[in-house]
A protein has these predicted regions:
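Nucleotidyltransferase catalytic core that binds NTPs
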Residues: 1-123
């Protein structure tokens, strides 16, 4: 599994199935999301997990989380700090610029309680 810690510019990926959230612990719901993106590998897509770095409230260490996600079939783990750019980005811009633009998402799946975008309780 490739691990990308974003501190500036996002990587340019293509043809990706993406799930996103904090993933501070890997519970049954998280596993189902990973299963959905992993299923897209049969279509030639990479399974990408976009995680907001919530290190102060993590249940697992970064290494534990990465190890579990790799075993579950994630190809790329993208970890990003919740910075002002993301925090103040409208949902539509986040989808266009980051998910579809930078991460090359052709498929996105999130949990039913996931919220993102300015004034929408991002992650």
């Amino acid at each position: 599994m490739e691990y990308l810690k974003i501190e500036g510019e996002f990587p340019k990926l293509a043809n990706c199935a993406v799930t996103m959230g904090k993933f501070d612990g890997i519970h049954r719901g998280h596993r189902k999301l990973v299963e959905k993106i992993r299923e897209r590998k049969t279509l030639g897509e990479q399974a990408v997990l976009f995680a907001i770095d919530a290190s102060s409230n993590m249940i697992l260490t970064r290494q534990e989380r990465a190890s579990i996600l790799e075993k579950l079939g994630v190809d790329v783990l993208v970890e990003c700090q919740l910075n002002d750019r993301i925090r103040h980005m409208k949902a539509e811009n986040f989808i266009k610029e980051i998910l579809m633009g930078d991460l090359g998402a052709s498929y996105v799946v999130v949990g039913e309680d996931n919220r993102f975008g300015f004034e929408s309780n991002l992650f």
